[in-house]
Amino acid sequence: MSGVWVFNNGVIRLVENPNQSGGVSTQSHGRRNVLVYLPTGEAVSSYSSLEQILRSLGWERYFSGDSDLIQYHKRSSIDLISLPRDFSKFNSVYMYDIVVKNPNSFHVRDFN
């Protein structure tokens, strides 16, 4: 069984396979998340815009044998950012990974 358990008015039910959309992570109850670049307030809407921002922060593309991933590394650290090649699979897990590795530059916000 996969899905999300929802408790509402004393009743618990399983909602199977909640929908997700690219670049915007859909949480239970219709909440969506976006990755925001703090200096400009811009919501990241594509990998090309994200790559420009990451490059300006010192991140470089890391080419590995995995064709399903886009990866970035920083020479000054051991950190590696791994993202799905398909932007429609970019969700809050990947967003928070970017935030943890760039805490003063990115933030995940609810978007309704």
Swiss-Prot record:
Membrane-spanning parts: none
Tissue specificity field: Expressed in leaves and in some parts of the flowers, mainly in the sepals.
InterPro entries the record matches: FPF1
GO biological process, one term: regulation of flower development
Function: Modulates the competence to flowering of apical meristems.
Family: Belongs to the FPF1 family.
Other facts noted in the record for this chain: Overexpression of FLP2 results in shortening of the time to flowering.
Name the record gives this protein: Flowering-promoting factor 1-like protein 2
Organism: Arabidopsis thaliana
Lineage start: Eukaryota, Viridiplantae, Streptophyta, Embryophyta, Tracheophyta
